[in-house]
Amino acid sequence: TAQDDLKAVFSGNFNQKLEFGGSINYILSRGHYQHQATKDLAYSIFGSYLGDRYDIQFFLNTYNFVNQENGGISDDTYILRPEEVQGGQSSVNTQTIPTNLTDAYNRIRGKEYYATQRYKFGFYQEEEQDTTVIRTFIPVTSIIHTIEYNENKHRFVNQSATEDTTYFANTYLGLGGTNEETRYQSIRNTFGISLLEGFNKYAKMGLAAYATYEYRHFSLPQDTLSAGTTIEGLTPRPDISNPRSHGESLLWVGGEISKQKGELLTYHVNGKFGLAGAIIGDIDVTADIRSRFRLWNDTVQLRA
């Protein structure tokens, strides 16, 4: 068994506010038995701009994963009694052991595109140091928008019609092999408004309220036969009907409270409530609480 792993990452700043980078990862594993190779190619682009009033962060990520399927060993004698099939030799080369499938594979492809942007309202605070006046922007309120797109495809292909009908117990759609694809897509938009932590001496925490709308779409293999249809050589199709495609809309409203400044206690609490779609009535609350303090000559950190 051998595996190759090539990975490269680049990230650089054009100036104090603008950053850009990318990565690529290629993995190839040949497997221990015949028709067991696996490879994955993933690459991404990312960047950010962090200004006084406007911020944006984004990344684009794609991957393409292919896995050969051999269906397992077709003759256990090669493992249990190898001398019977190798002219008396007890040692066996695993790459010569026959498998159930010789021309089949699974392919999974995916994309994830994400961007979040924020516009901040606030004021500039001036501080004089020696003969220089330093202006520092103090954000008070911000408007937030986040967009996320996901797409995932799964395809199973078996190009051997003979192995397709002998290996699988049931064959419903055709006798010429298998080529089936399922797909999932979603796009999510979030709009929110927040009061930023520390904009004045009484603001001990940050507050945010938001609404999220998501549309999901599912695509399944096309039925080529009607229910109850029987063709010679095929397994009679069950009397069920699945939609070729299906879409659904989801809507959440939620809020956050957070405190990230200081060491004694920091926390982040997020809660959202489902208003429409399959998640209507759902309540989702996540929290992260941390504490750090000195104890004698050491530092104690607690997290929950």
Question: Where is each model-derived feature located?
Answer:
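Exposed, low-structure sequence patches enriched in small/polar residues
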Residues: N100-T165, A169-A304
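Active-site-adjacent bridging/hinge elements
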Residues: E19-G21, G87-V92, I257-T266
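Predominantly transmembrane beta-strands of Gram-negative outer membrane beta-barrel pores used
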Residues: T1, D5-I27, F46-S48
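Outer-membrane beta-barrel translocator/channel fold
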Residues: H32-A42, F46-R109, L295-A304
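Short, glycine/acidic-rich beta->alpha junctions
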Residues: A2-Q3, L28, H35-F46, Q185, ...
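A structural signal for short, well-ordered beta-strand segments and their strand-loop junctions
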Residues: G21, I56-F59, S142-T146
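Transmembrane beta-strand segments that form the barrel wall of outer-membrane beta-barrel proteins
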Residues: T1, F20-H32, L264-G277
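Short loop/turn segments at secondary-structure transitions that flank enzyme active sites
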Residues: L28, R53, T62-V66, F123, ...
